Amino acid sequence: MSDTPLKCTTRHVRIFTATVEDNGELKASSDKLTLDLDPDNEFEWDQPVLAKVQQRFAELVDAAAGTELSDYNLRRIGTDLEGFIRQLLQAGELRYNLGARVLNYSMGLPRTPETL
């Protein structure tokens, strides 16, 4: 494997074929994936919601076991995970961080009981 990790980057999901070293640097890995969720802190993550996303990530990785570790397969996992995050937001389990640096509502305007 090369020294440059493969990566998938969506708006709220980053997946790397790498591990994070003690110094915070990424080290390429042919058998480990690192998940970076919501790097811009657009959402408020409660522990149960975070656990659901991590579980879904594990399911997607398990489903892809035995396939080539390629850009395409990483993008499929990342895109599916991004869709899952959208579902959580639409179901009201995840909410926007109103204290975020920028409020761009990238997954649609916030939903309130009055607008449902």
Curated annotation (Swiss-Prot):
MF terms (GO), sorted A to Z: oxidoreductase activity, acting on NAD(P)H, quinone or similar compound as acceptor; quinone binding
HAMAP family registered for this protein in UniProt: NDH1_NDH1M
InterPro entries membership: NdhM
Subunit description: NDH-1 can be composed of about 15 different subunits; different subcomplexes with different compositions have been identified which probably have different functions.
Membrane topology: Peripheral membrane protein
Family: Belongs to the complex I NdhM subunit family.
Keywords associated with the record: Membrane, NAD, NADP, Plastoquinone, Quinone, Thylakoid, Translocase, Transport
Biological function: NDH-1 shuttles electrons from an unknown electron donor, via FMN and iron-sulfur (Fe-S) centers, to quinones in the respiratory and/or the photosynthetic chain. The immediate electron acceptor for the enzyme in this species is believed to be plastoquinone. Couples the redox reaction to proton translocation, and thus conserves the redox energy in a proton gradient. Cyanobacterial NDH-1 also plays a role in inorganic carbon-concentration.
EC number(s) per entry: 7.1.1.-
Domain of life of the organism encoding this protein: Bacteria
A family per Pfam: NdhM
Reaction catalyzed: a plastoquinone + NADH + (n+1) H(+)(in) = a plastoquinol + NAD(+) + n H(+)(out); a plastoquinone + NADPH + (n+1) H(+)(in) = a plastoquinol + NADP(+) + n H(+)(out)
Stated name of the protein: NAD(P)H-quinone oxidoreductase subunit M
Main localization category: membrane
The keyword Translocase appears for this protein: yes
Record's subcellular location: Cellular thylakoid membrane
Gene Ontology cellular component annotations, sorted alphabetically: plasma membrane-derived thylakoid membrane
